[in-house]
């Protein structure tokens, strides 16, 4: 039976942590912010405005985002895929499964990274009318678009917010052990290749 495999992007498919740290360092310098990267990292998985709210920087989130985006995009081509990602996603599609992306990255940035990955059946980025993770909205929208029920859906993520979104959407969650988070889960993957 075919399934829908939904993937988070950062920390699951791409190793973007060095890029994020570089961009956050630029933000700290330009905007004279004393929030360490570890505090930012703990919020990864949420939409950027929500991260800024958690860090007490929401009143400046638009200007901070512009700095972050500019410095992050300068190095996008240097962000590698994790080992086995391309082949695993391709094999899942070859087996007749659907694959989708559910990320907190904006669509414009994702479009600059898409060429590194196989074609997805759907890509969900934050959009008006849908709450970001840990709310289930994006996952529910992906399933509706792909015509797949929660029981036939697997969400692979690396952060607590991914796990919460999966639980709230009623889908099976697989924790990506190689990612940015530090979770204790009943179901985890040592490598993305464990999916095939």
Question: Where in the sequence are the language-model features?
Answer:
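Short, acidic loop-to-helix structural element flanking the phosphoryl-transfer center
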Residues: 74-101, 111-114, 136
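Short glycine-/small-residue-rich flexible loop motifs, especially phosphate/cofactor-binding loops
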Residues: 25, 49, 89, 140, ...
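Residue-level detector of anion-binding/catalytic polar loops
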Residues: 34, 98, 172
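Asp-based, Mg2+/Mn2+-dependent phosphohydrolase catalytic module
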Residues: 1-3, 93, 106-196
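Short glycine/serine/threonine-biased micro-segments
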Residues: 9, 43, 98, 155, ...
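Conserved phosphate-coupling serine/threonine residues in phosphotransfer and NTP-handling enzymes
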Residues: 12, 103-105
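N-terminal helical cap/lid subdomain that shapes the substrate entry/recognition surface
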Residues: 2-86, 95
């Amino acid at each position: 039976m075919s399934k829908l495999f939904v993937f988070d992007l950062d920390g699951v498919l791409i190793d973007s942590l060095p890029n994020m740290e570089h961009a956050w360092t630029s933000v700290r310098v330009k905007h004279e912010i004393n929030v360490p990267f570890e505090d930012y990292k703990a919020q990864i998985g949420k939409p950027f405005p929500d991260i800024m709210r958690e860090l007490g920087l929401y009143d400046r989130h638009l200007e901070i985002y512009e700095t972050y985006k500019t410095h992050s995009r300068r190095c996008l081509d240097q962000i590698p895929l994790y080992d086995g990602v391309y082949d695993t996603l391709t094999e899942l599609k070859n087996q007749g499964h659907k694959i989708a992306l559910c990320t907190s990255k904006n669509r414009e940035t994702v479009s600059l990274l898409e060429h590194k990955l196989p074609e997805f059946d759907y890509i969900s980025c934050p959009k008006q009318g849908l709450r970001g993770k840990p709310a289930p909205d994006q996952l529910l929208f992906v399933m509706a678009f792909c015509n797949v029920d929660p029981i036939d859906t697997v969400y692979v993520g690396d952060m607590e917010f991914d796990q919460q979104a999966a639980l709230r959407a009623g889908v099976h969650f697989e924790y990506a052990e190689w990612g940015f988070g530090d979770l204790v889960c009943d179901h985890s993957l040592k490598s993305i290749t464990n999916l095939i």
